[in-house]
Each structure stands twice: as structure tokens, then as C-alpha cells.
């Protein structure tokens, strides 16, 4: 159930009864549970508009909420706030519904969309590094939530598998007579670095590299065979990383830059024909009045370089047109580094003008900040190199396994390693997903692997704590009437029933940290409930009810963490 909507509906009816039906309720959870479950903040605005005394008007609204099936009490506070407390019977009934439904009583959206979400998208011919982590796990979590809420999710891994870097690699391998050799990804990285030096320092080599790019684009069989070898090696590495991270991305989700190669010139020609793109110094440019350059003139969105070459803008336009026209997207999400914000704003504006992005199709740039080291600079190795993602994940698992072994010396090495993988990978992912994605955040091993505070290990341990209760519980009646008599029982019940509200918020805004914050709230609230309300030693009715709350807490934690892409353990 959507608890917020349910309470808001009751409050809106009370507003109508008080003669202010046209005013927004402005409902939000109370900051202090002692004041109730929700607070109405819309009365003061309505009073100002109606030229009435806000406290008197608030009292009318509160009186209209008397004898309500959902709301137990409505108390006026301050200049016109109304604190609402939910009826225990209403909470108990909905706890039963959530407990006995695989979807927790959460309805799928009545307006399902086809959502195309672009995430991860590394450049190929090199190993994935920490810079690829955020897009990969943020995009994966958003896609999981959207699918859970009933949408059709089309994942797109827009890998960088085309362009100058491949011409450089081919030129270098031919020059070194290694074009027929077998090689691995580490070799490709070494070759690429050497080729880049040659490209920057030797004009003749640079010309040769560009010639190979032309051959690649023209379908030369020899060059294409080498290119495919580069791509296959790189994608195999990427998929291994995705599998380690537990991502939903699969090989069939790959739709790289090369996919749109044949569409680039037609898109540019179409923009010219529509009068959007014009020639400027030999390049094809769309001038956008909505954006200004340093001189205050319309900004230039270059779609074709002087000499006929293409850019990211060309590929992204063709890609967007494909996603709307062929994949039938109702909504487009691009999970990309925040530094690309202007590019995507200009892409969307150009696409709207060209008719590639109709008004009934949504498009959003889902930007994210930078992973920082403790020194406040982008996260690097001690030698200043980019941290390879495989190395980071390996270290996470090793550190977590050591911590688990330290806490449980009796564990065998294999069991500690197994638990360590779940805890370590979960810790890395949660440390990221629990932060507002638009912010930079500091990567800190000690903080993320702590069993205290807002961390994956804390939430995973909270889940195992629930499981330990049921290992000792013996028989109990999951269908017995739920009785909520203690304040913490009611508070936990009300919080558990906000699951749908939170998931809908994540689906609407693409901010996974809302879900992380909710799960942490559930875990901390359960800890307080566990300490204050004996479960197994309580008398029969309370025992069953508290076991029901514990069961729903565990199920909610497990489902919520799964939507973040994080596994749980029955024992830690």
C-alpha cells in the first residue's frame, strides 16, 4: 500500500469539509515519533489564501478527522500544524496484508512505461576502473526498482567500441607485427598506452591511425577482425566485473557506439534538411538559443567535424532516435558523470527540436559525483594511478573476510571467504548507494566495512539477527490477528508500511539513497524494538504479533537490499 497517499486522501477530505478543498495538504512524516506519524503543513497557506486564522482553520480540519478509520488522532500544534497518529487497527490490518503477500501489498504502477536506462558504458580496450563503479551500480539499482514497480526496463550498455583509439591500436599492432598474435586485456592496455604516445608525438603515425579508422568504418575485413578481437576481450572482462558486482547487465544489453555507425550521416543530413544544423567553418553545427557561450551568443552543438568526422553528439543523437523509435521508450535515463550534464541538456534540446524526442517521452540526465580519496582528491592508487575495479573488489572481499574471521575465529577459511564476498561487495556498493548520487563522496574502507552505522554490514547483520530469532522461535501463528499495543510496535509497523512510498520515490526521482536511508531506519528501529519489546518470552498474542513484525522486517530488509543489488546472509 502507498501509506502516504492513503493518509493524504483522508486529509484532503478533511480539507474539503473545512472549506479549503482547493488547497494542497502538504503532508510529511513527523520528525519526532512522539508527535505522531504524519504532519499536515498546508493549513497555514490555505488560511492566508482564505484570510482565516490558521489555528482555528487547523482545528476545523482536525475535527473533520474525528472518527476516521485511518487516523486515530489529529492534534493542532504551533501556528497551524496538525500532527496525525494512525490507528493501531489500521496498521495491524495492513501489516497482515503485507506479511501475506509476496509483494508486501505493493501495487504495480497503473501506468507502466518502457524505460530505457543507459548505464556503465565503459570505453573498451582497457580495464574497468573505479570511475565506472558509480554508473554501474547506481544504474543497476534504479533499473531494479523500476522493474519491481511494474515497468518494462530496457538496459543499454553504451560501450565505447568505436573511434580513434581503435585506429591507434591497429596501427601500433601492425607496426609491431603483432596483428596476428593472441593477446589479453592487459596486453591491450599496454599497447594502447604505447600507441597513445606515438599518436601524440608522431604525425605520420597519427595519420596512419586515422586511415585505419576510415578502414574500420568502411568495413575492411582485416581491420574489423582485429577490432572484434579487441571488443570481445574487453567485453569478457567487463562481464566478469558485472558478475562479481551482481549486476543485471548481460551481454545482450551491450549496444555500443558501433551500433549506430550507419545512422550518423543520415542523422546529420536530417538535421540539415530540417534547418537545424548549418555549416560553420566546415563543420555542421546546431546553434541553440537556450544555451549561451562566453560571448553571450547561442551555444554550438557540433554534430559533424570539419572533414566529415563524427563526435559523441552525432552518436548520441542517432542512439536517442533509435531508443525512442525502435525500442519505443516512454522514458530515457542516462546514468552518467555529472560533468556531462551540459552535453545531455543540449542533446535533449536538439532532439526535441528535431522530433526525435516527442513531448510525451521523458528524458533525464541522472548525474553523479566523484569518488574521492581521504585526501579530498579523486580516488587513486598510492602511486597516483587509476584504481582498477577488479583490484578494488578483490581487496574488499579480502578485507571483509578478515573481519568476519576476526569476529568468528571458529569459521573455516572457505566459509569466511564466502561470507566475506557478500559482505565486501555489499559494503562497496552500499557506501556509494547510500549517498546522494549528485554528491562527491570519500572512499573509506574502515567506514564502509563497519558493523555500526549506516553501512551494508550493519543492515546485513540486522537481517541475520531476525533470522536468529526464528531459529529459536519454534511454532508460531503468522495468520493470528496482529496486536499493536506498545509505542515501538506501532512505530515499527508504520515504518514498514512506508515501503511502497519509498520505492515510488526512487522510481520517480532516480535517487537510490532514499531506499538506503529507509532500510537503515527500519534496521535501527527494529534494534530498538528488539531491546524494548521481548519477542520470544512475550505472552501468546504479543509473541505472535512481534514475530510478525520481525518477519516483515527481515523480508523488507532482504527485498530492499536486493533492489540495491546487495545480498543478505542467514548467518554472519
Swiss-Prot record:
Alphabetized HAMAP family for the sequence: Arg_tRNA_synth (MF_00123)
Q: Taxonomic classification, please?
A: Bacteria, Pseudomonadati, Pseudomonadota, Betaproteobacteria, Neisseriales
- Oligomeric and partner information: Monomer.
Q: Gene of origin?
A: argS
The record places the motif ('HIGH' region) at 122-132
Source organism: Neisseria meningitidis serogroup A / serotype 4A (strain DSM 15465 / Z2491)
- Write the protein's name: Arginine--tRNA ligase
Matching entries from SUPFAM superfamilies are given as: Anticodon-binding domain of a subclass of class I aminoacyl-tRNA synthetases, Arginyl-tRNA synthetase (ArgRS), N-terminal 'additional' domain, Nucleotidylyl transferase
Q: What is its EC number?
A: 6.1.1.19
Give this protein's Gene Ontology molecular function annotations.
Answer: arginine-tRNA ligase activity; ATP binding
- Keyword tRNA processing part of the UniProt annotation: no
Tell me if Aminoacyl-tRNA synthetase is a UniProt keyword of this record.
yes
Q: Which reaction(s) does its UniProt entry say it catalyses? A: tRNA(Arg) + L-arginine + ATP = L-arginyl-tRNA(Arg) + AMP + diphosphate
Similarity annotation: Belongs to the class-I aminoacyl-tRNA synthetase family.
Amino acid at each position: 500500500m502507498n501509506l502516504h497517499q492513503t493518509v493524504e486522501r483522508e486529509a484532503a477530505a478533511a480539507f474539503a469539509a473545512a472549506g479549503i478543498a482547493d488547497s494542497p495538504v502538504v503532508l510529511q512524516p513527523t520528525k519526532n515519533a512522539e508527535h505522531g506519524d504524519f504532519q499536515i503543513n498546508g493549513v497555514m497557506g490555505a488560511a492566508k489564501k482564505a484570510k482565516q486564522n490558521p489555528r482555528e482553520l487547523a482545528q476545523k480540519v482536525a475535527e473533520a478527522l474525528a472518527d476516521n478509520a485511518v487516523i486515530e488522532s489529529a492534534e493542532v500544534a504551533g501556528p497551524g500544524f496538525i500532527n496525525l497518529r494512525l490507528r493501531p487497527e489500521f496498521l495491524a490490518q495492513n501489516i497482515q496484508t503485507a506479511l501475506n503477500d509476496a509483494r508486501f501489498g505493493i501495487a504495480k504502477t497503473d501506468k507502466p512505461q518502457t524505460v530505457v536506462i543507459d548505464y556503465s558504458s565503459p570505453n573498451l580496450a582497457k580495464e574497468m576502473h573505479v570511475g565506472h563503479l558509480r554508473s554501474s551500480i547506481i544504474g543497476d539499482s534504479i533499473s531494479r526498482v523500476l522493474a519491481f514497480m511494474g515497468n518494462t526496463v530496457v538496459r543499454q550498455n553504451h560501450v565505447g567500441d568505436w573511434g580513434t583509439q581503435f585506429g591507434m591500436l591497429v596501427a601500433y599492432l601492425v607496426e609491431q607485427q603483432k596483428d596476428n598474435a593472441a593477446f589479453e586485456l592487459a596486453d591491450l592496455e599496454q599497447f594502447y598506452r604505447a600507441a597513445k604516445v606515438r599518436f601524440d608525438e608522431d604525425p605520420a603515425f597519427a595519420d596512419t591511425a586515422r586511415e585505419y579508422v576510415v578502414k574500420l568504418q568502411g568495413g575492411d575485413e582485416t581491420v574489423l577482425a582485429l577490432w572484434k578481437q579487441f571488443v570481445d576481450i574487453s567485453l569478457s572482462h567487463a562481464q566478469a566485473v558485472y558478475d562479481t558486482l551482481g549486476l543485471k547487465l548481460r551481454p545482450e544489453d551491450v549496444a555500443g557506439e558501433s551500433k549506430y555507425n550507419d545512422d550518423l550521416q543520415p542523422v546529420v543530413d536530417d538535421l540539415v534538411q530540417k534547418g537545424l544544423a548549418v555549416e560553420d567553418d566546415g563543420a555542421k553545427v546546431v546553434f541553440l538559443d537556450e544555451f549561451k557561450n562566453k560571448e553571450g551568443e547561442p551555444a554550438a552543438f557540433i554534430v559533424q567535424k570539419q572533414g566529415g568526422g563524427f563526435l559523441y553528439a552525432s552518436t548520441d543523437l542517432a542512439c536517442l532516435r533509435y531508443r525512442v523509435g525502435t525500442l519505443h521508450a516512454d522514458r530515457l535515463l542516462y546514468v552518467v558523470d555529472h560533468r556531462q550534464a551540459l552535453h545531455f541538456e543540449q542533446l535533449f534540446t536538439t532532439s526535441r527540436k528535431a522530433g526525435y524526442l516527442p513531448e510525451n517521452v521523458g528524458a533525464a540526465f541522472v548525474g553523479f559525483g566523484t569518488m574521492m580519496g581521504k585526501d579530498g582528491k579523486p580516488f587513486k592508487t598510492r602511486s597516483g594511478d587509476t584504481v582498477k575495479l577488479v583490484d578494488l573488489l578483490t581487496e574488499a572481499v579480502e578485507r571483509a573476510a578478515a573481519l568476519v574471521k576476526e569476529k568468528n575465529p571458529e569459521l573455516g577459511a572457505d566459509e569466511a571467504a564466502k561470507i566475506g564476498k557478500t559482505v565486501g561487495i555489499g559494503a562497496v556498493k552500499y557506501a556509494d548507494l547510500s549517498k546522494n548520487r549528485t554528491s562527491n563522496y570519500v572512499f573509506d574502507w574502515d567506514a564502509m566495512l563497519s558493523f555500526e552505522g549506516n553501512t551494508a554490514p550493519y543492515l546485513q547483520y540486522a537481517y541475520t539477527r531476525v533470522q536468529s530469532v526464528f531459529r529459536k522461535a519454534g511454532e508460531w501463528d503468522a495468520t493470528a490477528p496482529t496486536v499493536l499495543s506498545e509505542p515501538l510496535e506501532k512505530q515499527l509497523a508504520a515504518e514498514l508500511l512506508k515501503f511502497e512510498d519509498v520505492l515510488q520515490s526512487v522510481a520517480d526521482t532516480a535517487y537510490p539513497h532514499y531506499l538506503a536511508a529507509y532500510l537503515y531506519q527500519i534496521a535501527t528501529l527494529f534494534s530498538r524494538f528488539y531491546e524494548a519489546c521481548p519477542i520470544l518470552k512475550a505472552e501468546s498474542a504479543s509473541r505472535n504479533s512481534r514475530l510478525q513484525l520481525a518477519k516483515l522486517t527481515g523480508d523488507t530488509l532482504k527485498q530492499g537490499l536486493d533492489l540495491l543489488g546487495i545480498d543478505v546472509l542467514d548467518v554472519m
